[in-house]
């Protein structure tokens, strides 16, 4: 996306999102690529991988002192939408994802407690 347009729209766009709308649009996007001879979601998953790589690149720049929060924000938004694509394509519900995140966070909390870094 054009950087100037992205920055301009940041000032005028709502900060709340309608998750039903997001999943409806993403589902239509997945279904629109279904008849290209590839498995359902194939093209979308390729794009998700590309977005993950772009975020990785922006994080690398940040670690080298050449970061740009606008670029990071834009790529982070793309990756978050990519996560929703993966959920849609793989049939992973929000409930399942939330449970998995709780398991991971409990593990992290336990490690931090064991190392005296969290009480």
Cite the ranges covered by each PLM segment:
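Flexible "arm" and connector segments at domain edges
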Residues: 1-119
